[in-house]
């Protein structure tokens, strides 16, 4: 596969969506993408037609029909399997770039550390759902829990975002562990939006600039 797969990860309110929109405009004009390559923007859950339906079930279930933790985990795995097979892998095989708001790291952080489900089980499901696909580069937008809570209070929340501070603290710990273990690129997300955008641009130039590409 000659395309590039980029992922933004982080706790609620870290600014992933804002930075995704910025990169959607910046990357195609950056000179980093090969001629003819397109940029596919996507998210998890919800990157495919099936994923949109699964996203609604997971985040906004009807009435009191919230899925149990294990069922929730399996719904995320189903979304990812469809996402990889239907969108991500085909795009990469055609030489395009894919930029995703969340990927498998979020499942480990939220369902593993947050829900305290078995990490080994989650990693086994990750291998099945992704068929071994690993992002070329993952950015961790690191945000203090206190700031996340402040930002969350200023907007409407889905079922996961409405969880309490203890849950969010465990999730933040999970992201920190994953960033270290998986060599993610950490970026301080409690800066001005423009500063975070500039840091993202610098890192992308560092990893995918002409010199780096010639060494691959």
Curated annotation (Swiss-Prot):
It catalyses: dTMP + ATP = dTDP + ADP. Gene3D superfamilies: P-loop containing nucleotide triphosphate hydrolases. GO terms for biological process: dTDP biosynthetic process; dTTP biosynthetic process; dUDP biosynthetic process. Keywords: ATP-binding, Kinase, Nucleotide biosynthesis, Nucleotide-binding, Transferase. Pfam families: Thymidylate_kin. ATP binds at residues 10-17. Coiled coil: none annotated. One of its GO terms (cellular component) is cytosol. Belongs to the thymidylate kinase family. Phosphorylation of dTMP to form dTDP in both de novo and salvage pathways of dTTP synthesis. This is Thymidylate kinase. The gene is tmk.
């Amino acid at each position: 596969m000659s395309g590039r797969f980029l992922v933004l990860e982080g706790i609620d309110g870290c600014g992933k969506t804002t930075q995704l929109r910025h990169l959607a405009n910046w990357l195609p004009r950056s000179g980093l993408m090969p001629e003819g390559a397109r940029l596919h923007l996507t998210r998890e859950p919800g990157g495919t037609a099936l994923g949109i339906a699964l996203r609604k079930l997971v985040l906004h279930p009807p009435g009191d029909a919230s899925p149990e933790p294990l069922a929730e985990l399996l719904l995320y795995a189903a979304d990812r399997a469809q996402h990889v097979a239907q969108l991500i892998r085909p795009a990469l095989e055609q030489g395009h770039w894919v930029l995703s708001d969340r990927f498998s790291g979020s499942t480990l952080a939220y369902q593993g550390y947050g829900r305290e489900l078995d990490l080994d089980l989650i990693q086994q499901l990750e291998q099945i759902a992704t068929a071994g696909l690993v992002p070329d580069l993952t950015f961790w937008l690191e945000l203090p829990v206190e700031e996340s809570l402040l930002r969350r209070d200023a907007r409407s929340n889905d079922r996961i975002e409405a969880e309490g501070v203890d849950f969010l603290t465990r999730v933040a710990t999970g992201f920190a562990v994953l960033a270290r273990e998986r060599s993610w690129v950490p970026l301080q997300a409690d800066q001005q939006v423009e500063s975070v955008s500039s840091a993202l641009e610098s890192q992308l130039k560092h990893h995918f600039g002409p010199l780096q590409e010639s060494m691959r």
